[in-house]
């Protein structure tokens, strides 16, 4: 009786030892066929043609557009209840961070030097005003509203 039980266990283990190495072979072939080589697409830098003055002007325009949207609501809670407006602000925040990154990568410290067309005080004043309204564009598309 014990012999039959041991024989069944032995047969089961032998069966698993033979079958298990081949169990995963079919899945790998299917996965390899299904995978399409991914081509990394570099995002188009829409701000690449701007100079320092253009960067400042574009940043102020984005801040002004965002402020206009925010000011069309009495409270931040009212703004949050309108998904379309929230999406517009997130899109502007994303554009703002892309602009900052692009301009900083090209001009580095030059964007921090005030000039007639690079009015850093106005930019900071508008950014602070928007921040006081509850929107921090520097957070980009991760902006919490």
Regions from the language model: what does each represent?
Residues 28-71:
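Immediate post-signal-peptide N-terminus of mature secreted/exported proteins
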Residues 21-24:
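C-terminal motif of bacterial Sec signal peptides marking the signal peptidase cleavage site
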Residues 26, 54-56, 104, 118:
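Secreted/luminal cysteine- and crosslink-motif detector
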Residues 18-19, 46-48, 96, 110:
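Residue-level signal for mature regions of secreted extracellular proteins and peptides
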């Amino acid at each position: 009786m014990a012999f039959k039980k041991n024989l069944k266990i032995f047969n089961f283990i032998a069966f698993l030892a033979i079958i298990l190495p081949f169990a995963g072979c079919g899945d790998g072939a299917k996965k390899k066929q299904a995978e399409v080589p991914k081509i990394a697409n570099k995002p188009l830098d829409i701000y690449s043609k701007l100079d320092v003055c253009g960067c400042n002007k574009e940043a102020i325009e984005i801040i002004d557009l965002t402020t206009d949207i925010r000011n069309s609501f009495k409270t931040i809670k009212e703004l949050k209840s309108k998904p379309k407006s929230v999406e517009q602000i997130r899109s502007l925040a994303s554009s703002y961070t892309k602009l900052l990154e692009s301009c900083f990568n090209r001009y580095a410290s030059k964007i921090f030097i005030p000039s007639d067309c690079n009015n850093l005080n106005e930019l900071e004043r508008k950014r602070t005003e928007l921040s006081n309204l509850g929107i921090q564009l520097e957070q980009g598309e991760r902006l919490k509203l």
